[in-house]
A protein has these predicted regions:
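Glycine-rich phosphate-binding loop of actin/hexokinase-like ATP-binding domains
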Residues: 140-224
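Generic structural signal for well-ordered alpha-helical scaffold segments
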Residues: 62-66, 117, 121, 173, ...
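Gly/Ser/Thr-rich active-site cleft segment
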Residues: 77, 107-172
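Short, basic, glycine/proline-bearing loop/turn elements
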Residues: 43-45, 49, 98-106, 157-158
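Electropositive phosphate-/nucleotide-binding environments in soluble metabolic enzymes
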Residues: 52-59, 89, 93, 107-114, ...
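Short beta-strand-loop/turn "lid" adjacent to the catalytic site in phosphate-handling enzymes
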Residues: 62-110, 128-130, 136-147
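Gly/Thr-rich phosphate-binding beta-strand-loop-beta motif of the actin/hexokinase/Hsp70
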Residues: 1-36, 187-208
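Contiguous, glycine/small-aliphatic-enriched amphipathic segments in soluble metabolic enzymes
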Residues: 15-78
Length: 224
């Protein structure tokens, strides 16, 4: 079983899967401290009210699942900035430290996401946690897209465009392939429009450019 957490700038989204089937979705509105859900939610969560602290909410949901099924699921997190990580990674002390170094580049998402990860690790020491990154989808962009016109000494310090909302782009690509299996052989523009917003250019299934760059602050006007 897999429990997923997506810490957004305005919400916490949680989903629980068994054998590739989603059993429930739970969305916590951070400002309203209200939780909405669909599916077969554990009985202890039916009348649950958010505590207003993301890490406490995450631990409460994980504890409710453990009480219901007597098994700790694998936990997967959407992490906005992965730096040089191009694939999902298992979270340990080393990877957590590297992700913390990237927090200033996405201050609305990275710190609360890492706080949830740390809280779950403290509450459930045997829990396996995986991080999947918004930046990974853009890791194959051409140098023309990710290089800034800066001296090499600065570029060697990893000052470059990373691109974000990559997991959203991957999800859209998968859904489009169901409708048209030739979608990976052409040009495509993907618009991620929510509280955060970006546009991605895709060629033959590979990201070519994203309106965000070194940090999540670049590009289109957004909710914050």
């Amino acid at each position: 079983s897999v429990l997923t957490f997506n810490v957004g700038s305005s919400s916490l989204k949680i989903a629980y899967y068994q054998q590739q089937q989603c059993l429930f979705n739970l969305t916590v509105d951070i400002k309203q401290q209200r939780a909405n859900w669909t599916g077969q939610i554990p009985t202890s969560l039916v009348n649950w009210q958010s505590m207003g602290v993301l890490s406490d909410d995450a631990c409460y949901v994980a504890q409710a699942l453990y009480q219901q099924y007597q098994v700790l699921p694998l936990v997967a997190h959407r992490v906005v900035h992965g730096g040089h990580y191009h694939q999902p990674v298992m979270i340990n002390i080393e990877t957590l430290a590297k992700l913390q170094q990237l927090a200033p580049l996405c201050p609305l998402h990275q710190p609360p996401t890492l706080a949830v990860i740390e809280a779950l690790a403290a509450r459930f020491p045997q829990l396996i946690q995986i991080a999947a990154f918004d930046t990974s989808f853009h890791s194959q962009q051409p140098a023309l897209s990710y290089c800034y016109p800066l001296p090499l000494t600065l570029r060697n310090k990893d000052i470059r465009a990373y691109g974000f909302h990559g997991l959203s782009c991957q999800s859209i690509m998968r859904q489009l392939l169901v409708l048209d299996n030739t979608i990976n052989t052409g040009k495509l523009l993907i618009a991620h429009l929510g509280n955060g917003a970006s546009i991605t250019a895709v060629l033959d299934g590979i990201s070519q450019a994203n309106s965000m760059g070194f940090s999540t602050l670049d590009g289109l006007p957004m909710g914050t």
